[in-house]
Design a protein with these regions (language model features):
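N-terminal domain-onset segments
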Residues: 1-64
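Glutamate identity and glutamate-enriched acidic tracts
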Residues: 5-8, 23, 32, 39, ...
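Low-complexity intrinsically disordered segments
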Residues: 71-146
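Mature extracytoplasmic domains of secretory-pathway proteins
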Residues: 49-86
Length: 146
């Protein structure tokens, strides 16, 4: 699989999980990894505080992803968070925010705004994507990587 195909596979897995959990009432931030055998592993915190800061979430995932990178040959990883973002009028709208990385040096932040109807069905909207810096994998000139 190409790096892009690996990222797309992991995105499909985590989006399905996020959508299902949102329809059941929501989810706490979670992570996922993909190994060379196309095996996805979920990383679920055992608990989370209701009003947690983004800095604490980032620090938590740095520790968890570092452990995952050290203990297995993962190629792709991501973190998934249910967020509220301001629209053009300043009204807060719900979204699924995903930070995804590939060990080859590719990283993206992706935001999927979503709507929820009266039957709790969640519909993901067109995502906004932005290339970003790696947060969890080491830089591409480090020869110690896979």
């Amino acid at each position: 699989m190409t790096p892009q195909e690996e990222k797309e596979l992991l995105l499909r897995v985590v989006l399905r999980i996020a959508q299902t959990q949102l329809e059941k009432g929501g989810f706490i931030p979670f992570g996922a990894t993909l190994g060379p055998g196309r095996e996805a592993q979920l990383l679920m915190p055992t608990s989370a505080k209701r009003e947690i800061t983004i800095d604490k979430v980032v620090a938590y995932w740095k520790v968890q992803m570092s452990k995952a990178i050290e203990t297995s040959k993962i190629t792709t990883l991501c973190t998934v968070t249910d967020v509220r973002i301001p629209d053009n009028d300043g009204k807060l709208i719900p979204g699924v925010f995903i930070h995804i990385e590939h060990w080859a040096g590719d990283a993206e932040d992706i935001l999927f705004p979503y709507t929820k109807d009266e039957n709790a069905k969640v519909t993901l909207q067109e995502p906004a994507k932005e290339a970003t810096n790696l947060q969890f994998f080491v830089t591409s000139d480090d020869s110690s990587r896979h």
